[in-house]
């Protein structure tokens, strides 16, 4: 499995590396022109937008790499590897989490450098919200641990939901406009999921660990369903 993970990381690093190098370049260059912008808020807005784009394109690369390696010509090679589908999906998920963690770390370091360079006190906290890092205002390690676990499994369920939708769009139930269908199904799923979450009893929502357990259940569900679809329902183009 380690060899499979190594191959997955090496075969997908180029698009991630390009976006991260662009962001690092912007972080190094922009402080030199901060006086031209006139106000620090202008610099903040520019880099915050770029940070958002870095995270967005990281997610986009995760989805594209999964699609390319599973449902294009490369998919035939992937499906003939001497490993089972559970291992393939797990390795792809692990690779996605690694690249997302690297992107988040680079964004954090880059914005920290900018906040020190241009002395914007609220800059770093704003990017923490973008990346999803918990705000630590006091030493409550139990809450911090809960926040990190919830964040991890929210990210995991988000990635696996994309894997599931893309896989479902390549079953015999959908034969035309598969990419458009996958996008439509994904947004319908987001809407239905939000409505379902709103209907849950308040006593459940007040439990500190509810969000973490909910995301863990979603992650397991999407993982198992994706493996099942690829093993039993997949229809290659």
Positions of PLM-derived features:
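Hydrophobic alpha-helical transmembrane segments of membrane proteins
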Residues: 1-75, 85-237
């Amino acid at each position: 499995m380690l060899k499979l993970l190594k191959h997955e990381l090496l075969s997908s690093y180029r698009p991630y590396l390009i976006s991260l190098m662009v962001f690092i370049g912007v972080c190094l260059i922009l402080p030199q022109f901060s006086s031209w912008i006139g106000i620090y808020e202008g610099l903040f807005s520019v880099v915050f937008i770029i940070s958002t784009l870095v995270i967005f394109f990281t997610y986009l690369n995760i989805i594209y790499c999964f699609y390319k390696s599973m449902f294009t010509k490369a998919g035939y090679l992937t499906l003939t590897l001497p490993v089972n589908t559970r291992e393939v999906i797990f390795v792809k998920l692990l690779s996605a989490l690694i690249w997302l963690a690297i992107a988040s770390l680079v964004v954090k370091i880059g914005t920290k450098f900018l906040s020190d360079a241009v002395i914007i006190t609220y800059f770093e906290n704003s990017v923490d919200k973008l990346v999803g890092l918990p705000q630590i205002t006091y030493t409550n390690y139990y809450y911090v641990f809960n926040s990190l676990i919830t964040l991890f499994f929210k990210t995991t369920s988000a990635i696996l939901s994309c894997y599931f939708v893309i896989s479902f769009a390549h079953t015999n139930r959908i034969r035309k406009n598969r990419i458009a269908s996958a996008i439509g199904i994904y947004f319908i799923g987001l809407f239905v999921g939000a409505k379902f979450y709103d209907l849950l009893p308040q006593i459940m929502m007040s439990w500190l660990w509810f969000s973490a357990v909910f995301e863990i259940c979603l992650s397991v569900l999407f993982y198992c369903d994706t493996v099942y679809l690829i093993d039993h329902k997949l229809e290659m183009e």
